From Swiss-Prot:
Protein task: Involved in transcription antitermination. Required for transcription of ribosomal RNA (rRNA) genes. Binds specifically to the boxA antiterminator sequence of the ribosomal RNA (rrn) operons.
The protein's name: Transcription antitermination protein NusB
Organism: Sulfurimonas denitrificans (strain ATCC 33889 / DSM 1251)
Gene designation per UniProt: nusB
Flavoprotein is among the record's keywords: no
Family (UniProt): Belongs to the NusB family.
Keywords (A to Z) from UniProt: RNA-binding, Transcription, Transcription antitermination, Transcription regulation
Gene Ontology molecular function, alphabetical: RNA binding
Pfam families recorded: NusB
One cellular-component annotation, GO: cytosol
Top-rank taxon: Bacteria
GO biological processes: DNA-templated transcription termination; transcription antitermination
Keyword Lipid metabolism: no
Length: 132
């Protein structure tokens, strides 16, 4: 059975695909989650997160842009942008403590991002959590 961490990693993958221009990714979420062995309650969790990010993409992106220091949103790597979107959504609209959300995002970034990404992600999300 998949963990919530694995479900979040799958959501980052979905957001990454969306960001790279795969506009019809929503049509393939079930098969992508199945391929990653995200099933049952974790599938419901992943879909809730993905759909929540997509439904709130404008306020999520605005919160990220507001807290980028000397960075242009469009210059962010697609993995970093996807991770920030998921974590920002959870900070703004979720029920988990911000510290838990930030830690999850940092761990996901360690798996997918560059060497500098975890520190960057941590800083942006910390600023967002303090401002919410």
């Amino acid at each position: 059975m998949a963990t919530r961490h694995q479900a979040r990693m799958a959501v980052v993958s979905l957001l990454y695909a969306f960001d790279l221009g795969n506009g019809n990714i929503a049509e393939h979420t079930d098969e992508i989650l199945e391929e990653k062995k995200i099933r049952n309650k974790q599938k419901d969790f992943a879909l809730t997160l993905y759909e929540g990010v997509m439904a709130n993409i404008t306020p999520v992106d605005e919160a990220i842009v507001k807290h980028l220091k000397d960075w242009d949103f469009e210059r962010l790597g697609a993995i970093e942008r996807a991770t920030l979107r998921l974590a920002t959504y959870e900070i703004l609209f979720g029920e988990l403590d911000s510290a838990v959300v930030i830690n999850e995002a940092v761990e996901i970034t360690k798996a997918f991002g560059t060497e500098q990404s975890p520190k960057f992600i941590n800083g942006v999300l910390d600023a967002i959590s303090k401002d919410k």
